[in-house]
């Protein structure tokens, strides 16, 4: 019972603390992040997800011994790239 009451008080305290220390205009920060993400989706060259590593081996090529990660494009090496 005491533990439950302490947990409730702790949660209420932490909730109040986040509201007290919150940035007054945090919605502007979120809006700027949204606009930046929108700009990157419109400009595909700016997106870092579109970068392709052409130095990897295609499936079926010999890659060596057991590895996870490069040099295989899939990331799996079991003597041949999977």
From Swiss-Prot:
Pfam families, per database record: Conotoxin (PF02950)
UniProt GO MF annotations: calcium channel regulator activity; ion channel inhibitor activity; toxin activity
Residues spanning the signal sequence: 1-22
Propeptide residues, chain positions: 23-52
UniProt record similarity statement: Belongs to the conotoxin O1 superfamily.
Record localization: Secreted
Transmembrane intervals: none
Protein name: Omega-conotoxin-like MaIr137
Gene source species: Conus marmoreus
Entry function: Omega-conotoxins act at presynaptic membranes, they bind and block voltage-gated calcium channels (Cav).
Keyword annotations: Calcium channel impairing toxin, Disulfide bond, Ion channel impairing toxin, Knottin, Neurotoxin, Presynaptic neurotoxin, Secreted, Signal, Toxin, Voltage-gated calcium channel impairing toxin
Summary of the tissues where the protein is detected: Expressed by the venom duct.
Disulfide bonds: 56-73, 63-77, 72-81
């Amino acid at each position: 019972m005491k533990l439950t009451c302490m947990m409730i008080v702790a949660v209420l305290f932490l909730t109040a603390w986040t509201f007290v220390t919150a940035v007054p205009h945090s919605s502007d920060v979120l809006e700027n992040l949204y606009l930046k993400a929108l700009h990157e989706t419109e400009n595909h060259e700016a997106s870092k997800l579109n970068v392709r590593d052409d130095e990897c081996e295609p499936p079926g090529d010999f890659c060596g011994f057991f590895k996870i990660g490069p040099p295989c494009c899939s990331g799996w090496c079991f003597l041949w790239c999977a």
